[in-house]
Amino acid sequence: ELIKSWEAGLDVRFLQNRLGLDFAWYKTNATRQLLNLPLDPFAGYSSRKVNAGNIQNEGLEISLNGAIFQSPDVQGFNWNATAQFSLNRNKIIDLYPGVTLYDIKTLDAIQIVAAQGSYYGDIYGQTFLRVTDKDSPHYGKVIVGDDGLPLISAEKSKVGNQSPDWMLGLTNSFSYKGFNLSFLVDFRIGGDIYSATASNLFVRGNAAGTVVNGERQDFVVPNTVVRKDGGYVENNVPVTHQNYWERIGSTGNYGLPEVFTYDATNIRLRNITLGYTFNRAMLKKTPFQRLNLSATCNNVWMIHYNLPGIDPESVSATNTNATGFENG
């Protein structure tokens, strides 16, 4: 593997070091990476290893820290804050001659891939069958069968990407008369994740979304059409909730990827730490020169998330780079 990298940075301080800004831009190209390419079964081997590919990482890292309030008294009230922002774009420039899609991880109907010309971690899976004629007034609508249930495409297509658009961490630290309190709020904005847990809940009828207005009445699948006389007409065939979710869950063991791929955006109170530092006078008759006692609580509060009651960080394939799949 060969790596070429470029980096530029800036470090500035203001107001007698009470305010600081660190800025870094980077760009790296990793080539000749070790890839496993599948072979014809008649070759006697399942795959071969080759050195190929060109993966480009480009991103920004910005850190802003400040002493919001400083007391002239050592034991007085102090408040310090830090904001750390980062974004990264991991683009697949090239893979291998004749190869445009490289499998990172396949889990039943879900496939995490590196697609040439796209970004690392694209999520591929089956989707609803839709009207593809752009000249049709029904373009983009879901096609259903005569039974009113959606038809499923046979081929996989892109339904999302596992990488976040950007991330931000906000840390605040307070101290007063030996006591210290700090907390961290994390922002993970963008990216997608497929939830097998949500699929199981919906398909079994245990999710709140399977009930409309407190009842499971028959309904017409919205924004759908049915084939008729060489064209399409609006669908008006009612279906039961059970039949609908059974159809959605009929794609592999984990259900239809298009339906159960969610925006992985989440904002959380990552941790809180409360501590107390004993002064030297209190430690005179002890063998300690300095003593601090603290208690920490992690994953305190999920402020915002899009998955139905599921932590988007509870990924399934933790031993690989395929983080776009959850099966809690």
Predicted region positions:
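Extracellular/periplasmic, surface-exposed regions of secreted and cell-surface proteins
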Residues: 1-116, 256, 260-328
